[in-house]
Amino acid sequence: MITYDDEVVCAPRAGTLYDVLELILDRGMVIDVFVRVSLVGIEILKVDARIVVASVDTYLRFAEACNRLDLEHDVRSKTVPEMFGSPMAKTVGRAGARRTARSLTDKVRDVLTPEHEHEEEPEEAEDRPRAGAERGRSTQRPRSRPAARPRDEDDRPRSRPRRRTEEEDR
């Protein structure tokens, strides 16, 4: 049983929908959700949602008590476009572009060099000592491809001689 200050006894009764809504609007019901998902310091997802079933006065009292009246941008958090606009991201992008260009030039060089040069390269590679075996104090890194040399007119790519088939040799 419920008793009030007036010492009036009220029997519990089933409330109507109107009574429930009046109680909710009077006291208010606020579901406040703030979710931030970060991976290694990079903010991937940020959700700030409020579901409010309350009177305006109740909501304003709640927001003021929780310091959630305004949803401003947090200067400490970075968004994905800000991450890609940073100088660090630009240098990483340049390095990737350089690697891609290098691999493309290697592929073109492989296609344009005659095949008999490719057959000699494995023998030369066996004769040379491995770079990992000699751990000297050199200042240069071992190169994975031959050093670039100045180009002359004789260095232009030439067409490959056509191979003869067995039938043509007879």
From Swiss-Prot:
Matches recorded under InterPro entries: Gas-vesicle_GvpA-like, Gas_vesicle_GvpA, GvpA, GvpA-like_CS
Pfam families in the record: Gas_vesicle
Keywords for this protein: Gas vesicle
Annotated Basic and acidic residues bias: 104-119, 127-137, 149-170
Localization, UniProt: Gas vesicle shell
Induction: Constitutively transcribed at low levels, repressed by argR.
An example Gene Ontology CC term for this record: gas vesicle shell
Coiled coil: none
Keyword Lyase: no
Renumbered residue ranges of the record's region Disordered: 86-170
Role noted for this protein: Gas vesicles are hollow, gas filled proteinaceous nanostructures found in some microorganisms. During planktonic growth they allow positioning of the organism at a favorable depth for light or nutrient acquisition. GvpA forms the protein shell. It is not clear what function GVs perform in soil bacteria.
Subunit structure: The gas vesicle shell is 2 nm thick and consists of a single layer of this protein. It forms helical ribs nearly perpendicular to the long axis of the vesicle.
Family affiliation: Belongs to the gas vesicle GvpA family.
Protein name from the UniProt record: Gas vesicle protein A2
Top-level taxonomy: Bacteria, Bacillati, Actinomycetota, Actinomycetes, Kitasatosporales
